[in-house]
A protein has these predicted regions:
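N-terminal periplasmic/intermembrane-space "pro-region" immediately following the signal or transit peptide
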Residues: 1-64
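Residue-level detector of alpha-helical segments with a strong bias toward transmembrane helices
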Residues: 14, 19, 70-71, 76, ...
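Outer membrane beta-barrel
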Residues: 47-70, 79-81, 85-201, 211-226
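Outer-membrane beta-barrel proteins
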Residues: 70-74, 128-131, 158, 203-205, ...
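Solvent-exposed loop segments that connect transmembrane elements
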Residues: 75-85, 201-212, 264-281
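Detector for outer-membrane/organellar transmembrane beta-barrel domains
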Residues: 214, 219-282
């Protein structure tokens, strides 16, 4: 009887221990659902929502290699032949460069309109001279207001020099500058711009950075329709106290064929930030 009672007590004890272990067992939680990146199609293709925000981001860029030669683009190289007992000599050869461009775009809807940004950084190796890095764009825009690093409105508002090869044969305007600008866009093809700009310390080899609190000023107007468009833009260089202006006419012959004519004028034969060409007319 005592042995039987002992066996039953042991069984009860083991059962109690087993129940306690079951009560203390670690329960493995279900895995958290994975939050995949959401596609944002508000601003076009390639955008996605930054996780945890309503800001859309697009990342892009390109790789470019360019080689050129001839009288307009070739470069002169000096060969050191003194080690061979000769004299230095010069030869002409082609110019070349390789470029990596990294770009970002962001967009967010606010009560005041679309808040957007754009950046572009370029890494370039030219003619074996080492790598150079440049910040070409870094601006913020809210509605029609834009601030930051951009290219001068005097150059961009009229459409640069068109979609042509070697558009820099005749200088037509400045590029790098910090600016504060506002662009008005009407519903009938009319638009206008005003831009306050700081200039650049190195534009076509000259220093046009502002020297006091008076900025350079750009103003322009443009009318665009299906047949083409007309644009006029003027600028005041506050450092040299001179001005320049450009007018451009675009004609679209077909969906793939177009032509334009552009003319520039400055009030002085000397150069200024907005008149990189020699003489008054260009």
């Amino acid at each position: 009887m005592n042995i039987k009672s002992l066996l039953l007590g042991s069984a009860v004890a083991f059962a109690a221990v087993g129940g306690a272990q079951a009560a203390d067992a670690v329960v493995v939680a279900d895995p958290e659902p994975v939050e995949y990146v959401r596609v944002c199609d508000v601003y076009g293709t390639g955008y996605f929502y930054i996780p945890g925000t309503e800001t859309c981001l697009r990342i892009g860029g390109y790789v470019r290699y360019q080689v050129s030669g001839g009288d307009l683009w070739e470069r002169t190289r000096v060969h050191d032949d003194t080690l061979l007992g000769g004299e230095d000599r010069t030869d002409e050869t082609y110019s070349q460069y390789s470029r990596l461009s990294l770009q970002t775009w962001t967009g967010t809807e606010t009560e005041l309109g679309t808040l957007s940004t754009y950046t572009e950084t370029r890494f370039q190796w030219a003619n074996g001279g080492g790598t150079t890095t440049s910040l070409n764009f870094a601006w913020i825009q809210l509605g029609g207001f834009r601030v930051g690093k951009d290219e001068s409105a005097y150059t961009t508002f009229a459409g640069y020099a068109g979609g042509v090869i070697a558009d820099d044969l005749v200088p037509y305007g400045p590029f790098d500058t910090n600016l504060i600008s506002y662009t008005f866009t009407g519903g009938n093809g009319f638009s206008a711009i005003i831009s306050l700009e700081s200039g650049s310390a190195d534009s076509y080899g000259h220093d046009y950075d502002i020297t006091d609190y008076v900025p350079h000023v750009v103003a322009g107007a443009k009318f665009t329709q299906g047949w083409g468009g007309v644009s006029l833009v003027g600028a005041y260089d506050s450092v040299h106290e001179t001005w320049a202006a450009k007018a451009r006419l675009d004609v679209n012959a077909t969906d793939t064929i177009s032509a334009f004519i552009m003319a520039g004028y400055g009030d002085d034969d000397d150069f200024n930030f907005y008149k990189p060409w020699g003489g008054e007319w260009a």
